[in-house]
Amino acid sequence: MKIILTQEVSGLGAPGDIVEVKNGYGRNYLLPQGFAIAWTKGAEKQVTLIKRARSAREIRDLGHANEVKGQLEGLKVTLKARAGDGGRLFGSVTAAEIVAAVKAAGGPTLDRRRLELPSHIKSIGSYPVRIKLHPEVTAAFDLSVVQG
């Protein structure tokens, strides 16, 4: 079955990629979850739109990715969140909040979907955060969550 990915699926591809998958995987998982659409001639226009949007926010080349990695590695990112007396947060820290904290700390603008968090951040402390800037470049920085 030929499908067009609308979201990044690990081990399969990026948005806009046309891939061949087994019928059951496509019909029972990818299509109902919204990860893909069925391939048709009319869907070619949608593929073009997805690829255009991806290229607009993608880091262009390896050199630029390494430059952004250098900016992130030396960055001290602190995020203030509401917490109770025991240090447990009211809710959890989202990827969008982390991206905003990086921007506020003087870092580059990042895509929240490329963040790789070790687990849900639900308490005050220091956490390692990784971000995949390019297929060959991954940057890491420490996020400090403080009561605020």
From Swiss-Prot:
GO terms for biological process: translation. Coiled coil: none annotated. GO terms for cellular component: ribonucleoprotein complex; ribosome. Keywords: Ribonucleoprotein, Ribosomal protein, RNA-binding, rRNA-binding. It holds the Pfam family Ribosomal_L9_N. One of its GO terms (molecular function) is rRNA binding. Gene3D superfamilies: Ribosomal protein L9, C-terminal domain (3.10.430.100), Ribosomal protein L9, N-terminal domain (3.40.5.10). Binds to the 23S rRNA. PANTHER family: 50S RIBOSOMAL PROTEIN L9. Belongs to the bacterial ribosomal protein bL9 family. This is Large ribosomal subunit protein bL9.
